[in-house]
Amino acid sequence: MIRILVLCSGNAARSQIAEGLFRAHGQGTVEIHSAGTQPAGFVHPLAIRTMLERGIDISQQKSKSLRYYENQRFDYVITVCDDAQLECPLFPGAYEQLHWSTPDPSFFPGPESEQLDAFRRTIDSLSSHILRLLEQLKNKKAASQ
């Protein structure tokens, strides 16, 4: 099984959304984890709410520190914020590192309706990246058989 770690700074919104999307779209083909370089200690309520709109429940996910994963092996390490890309440590073994620069929706100013739209845009953006990667993985697997 392909092991993937998604990193952002707080592990409260973007990487949590990505973890939930990988679980939903990967349908058991990937082992997905997320972490933060400076974990917030919670999953953002608007991330939970907007993912539920898509039928994906991330309410039981936990905000985790990158340190928990430091000596583990992954096939892919994906950073979804520029700070995490700069702070991303080296992991053991061979892996592919991807960077999907994604603005933090939790910093979007304005009324809640506009904040919700920012979270929805984040979900759409990450979903596009994730579906593309999953398709590439599927094609690689088919080509190797």
Residue ranges and their predicted role:
Residues 36, 81, 101-103:
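Residues at the C-termini of beta-strands that transition into short coil/loop
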Residues 71-73:
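Alpha-helix C-terminal capping/helix-to-coil transition sites in glycosyltransferase folds
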Residues 55-61, 83-92:
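Short, Lys/Arg-enriched charge-dense amphipathic segments
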Residues 10-12, 82-85:
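Short glycine-rich anion-binding loops that position phosphate/pyrophosphate groups of nucleotides
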Residues 17, 26, 30, 58, ...:
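Generic alpha-helical hydrophobic packing signal
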Residues 85-145:
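Phosphate-binding/catalytic loops
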Residues 1-68:
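Conserved active-site segments centered on acidic
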